[in-house]
From Swiss-Prot:
Pathway: Aminoacyl-tRNA biosynthesis; selenocysteinyl-tRNA(Sec) biosynthesis; L-seryl-tRNA(Sec) from L-serine and tRNA(Sec): step 1/1. It comes from the Bacteria. GO terms for molecular function: ATP binding; serine-tRNA ligase activity. Its EC number is 6.1.1.11. This is Serine--tRNA ligase. NCBIfam families: serS (TIGR00414). L-serine binds at T233, S234, E235, E287, S387. It catalyses: tRNA(Ser) + L-serine + ATP = L-seryl-tRNA(Ser) + AMP + diphosphate + H(+); tRNA(Sec) + L-serine + ATP = L-seryl-tRNA(Sec) + AMP + diphosphate + H(+). InterPro entries: aa-tRNA-synt_IIb, aa-tRNA-synth_II, aa-tRNA-synth_II/BPL/LPL, Ser-tRNA-ligase_type_1, Ser-tRNA-synth_1_N, SerRS_1_N_sf, SerRS_core, tRNA-bd_arm. Keywords: Aminoacyl-tRNA synthetase, ATP-binding, Cytoplasm, Ligase, Nucleotide-binding, Protein biosynthesis.
Length: 426
């Protein structure tokens, strides 16, 4: 959530910044009308509260003197009805204003390129040279499906489209990748392994920015009066660990990692990436989350992105690093780097990691704070999140980049200890 002071004091300036950087249209006329109405109702509510308190005090004094208080009691009762109506009206208009505030995207950091979509992202660097094959390259489906290792048909029978059953050595490769990533981030990068719930409440989804804007892309479940959401990323539970907390400065930065299932409805994906495992309703990811002091978030962003890069480098997978433009950034981010891995079958780079600095945007929604030792006062944290990396896409990249002419797949050196020493699949 953006600073409410921006909405109240500079709505026109904020609207222009949102329009020019995010392509977002803020109705300032509606906002100013609601804010004016809020002030009017709030003043009247405070007047009624003051009158009620004054009359209540007078009742106490009259009772102490043994005087008849019936008339005063009747006045207070009248105030009570009007006060309740005024308080309800104030709550309703505050809810409308909060709804507007919750729907506003974050403002990009200085230096983020202006642009309308991914075509205007800026490539920062490349690592590795895509392999030149002397045979016809197969995609991950052609490599896995003939052996039954990758089975979309059975998954469709069980669950519908955009699910996959993995078997045998490919299922083991998938598991090995997740274990390798976790061990790397915990053992070498200093993240704390954390096992988190896959079902979270609405407050958690609001805290990280999935609600209310992206509800259509979420799976949810209701039991009785209890509603829970399946997480689209473990960023949600990891980041919400600091919700409504005041963290001591000595504990910062908090660096957490989790391997989890992720669930996405892919409501806006249409017919994109329907083949294989590129875009699934259920997939696995190793997530990185950091909460830190504001002055450290830029450095933590660079560090987090580098941690994700190391995963790909140790796997020997060519990739490129891209700085996202304003039109391609996520809702909560002020700055985002994407890592895109080379897929030979598509002859292009595809996203495998996205690392974002969210500034104080999520922290304000969550009331996640730290105690500044200089001022001694609680201040908003900065939060960051990144994929370290998507497990399914890493498996696809390994299968395709390490394939042989006979359809077998070499196992990258760093994964062999997790594969029982197996050097080749197939």
């Amino acid at each position: 959530m953006l600073d409410p002071a921006l909405l109240r004091q500079h709505p026109a300036d904020l609207a222009e910044r949102l329009r020019s950087t995010r392509g977002f249209s803020l109705d300032t006329a509606e906002l100013e009308s609601l804010e004016s109405e809020r002030k009017r109702i709030q003043v009247r509510t405070q007047e009624l509260q003051s009158q009620r308190n004054s009359k209540s005090k007078a009742i106490g004094q009259a009772k102490a003197k043994g005087e008849d208080v019936a008339a005063l009691m009747a006045e207070v009762a009248g105030f009570g009805d009007e006060l309740k109506a005024s308080e309800d009206a104030l709550d309703a208009i505050r809810a409308k204003l909060e709804g507007i505030a919750l729907g506003l995207p974050n403002l990009p950091a200085e230096g983020v390129p202006l642009g309308k979509d991914e075509s205007e992202n800026l490539e920062q660097s490349r690592w590795g040279t895509p392999r030149q094959f002397d045979f016809a390259v197969k995609d991950h489906v052609e490599l896995g499906a003939p052996h039954g290792w990758l089975d979309g048909e059975t998954a469709a029978k069980l669950s519908g489209a955009r699910f996959t059953v993995l078997r045998g050595p490919v299922a083991r490769l998938h598991r090995a990748l997740a274990q390798f990533m976790l061990d790397l981030h915990v053992g070498e990068h200093g993240y704390e392994e954390t096992n988190v719930p896959l079902l979270v409440n609405a407050d958690s989804m609001r805290g990280t920015g999935q609600l209310p804007k992206f509800e259509d892309d979420l799976f949810q479940t209701e039991v009785g009066e209890s509603r829970r959401y399946l997480i689209p990323t473990s960023e949600v539970p990891l980041t919400n660990i600091v919700r409504e907390e005041i963290v001591d400065a000595e504990r910062l930065p908090l660096r957490m990692t989790a391997h989890s299932m992720c669930f996405r409805a892919e409501a806006g994906s249409g017919g994109r990436d329907t083949r294989g495992m590129i875009r699934q309703h259920q997939f696995e990811k190793v997530e990185l989350v950091t909460a830190c002091a504001p002055e450290d978030s830029d450095a933590e962003h660079q560090r987090m992105t580098r941690c994700a890069e190391v995963v790909l480098e140790q796997l020997g997978l060519p990739y490129r690093k891209v700085l996202l433009c304003t039109g391609d950034m996520g809702f909560s981010a002020i700055k985002t780097y994407d890592l895109e891995v080379w897929l030979p079958s598509q002859n292009t780079y595809r996203e495998i990691s996205s690392c974002s600095n969210c500034g104080d945007f999520q922290a304000r929604r969550m009331q996640a704070r730290w105690r500044n030792p200089v001022s001694g006062k609680p201040e908003l944290l900065h939060t960051l999140n990144g994929s370290g990396t998507a497990v399914g896409r890493a498996m696809i990249a390994v299968m395709e980049n390490y394939q042989n002419a006979d359809g077998s797949i070499d196992v990258p050196q760093v994964l062999r200890p997790y594969m029982g020493g197996i050097e080749r699949i197939g």
